[in-house]
Amino acid sequence: MFAVRSMLRAGSRAATPLRAFSTSSMRQANTLLFVEHKNGVINPASLSAVTAAQKLGGEIHALVAGSSSHAKAVAEAASKVQGVSKVLVSTSDAFSALLAEPIAPLIESLVKSKSYTHVVAGHTAVGRDIIPRAAVCLDSSQVSDIIDRKSTRLNSSH
């Protein structure tokens, strides 16, 4: 299931939405975080997505896709983000514009080969483009505008 989640950052009054994808609720969560960036700087929405991914439990692996000139600097910055246990870097000029067409198949490949249970991205125009296409590639559905996760039980009444 893909979802858009709005999580409150510590000390923030405004909710920062993010997009997430889940393949299973039955096993330990392992999250692939798509890191959005521009000119070598991580988009703040991606940092909010880390906070939400931490609520899922398990490891968080950051995916940095982009041109080689920016991806390395972004990967270094992502490796310093608290909660991120591993950074995956994929460099190609095809990834430089952060378009869904080349990145969604990359996400699909990683989810299938590494058995990620969730994919999370900041709720931005880029996230709204990439995550739904990745859901289609993985034959999954999308759920939008989830505010918070209250329970891990599927049929929870609270």
Report each predicted region and the residues it spans.
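Positively charged, low-complexity/disordered segments
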Residues: 154-158
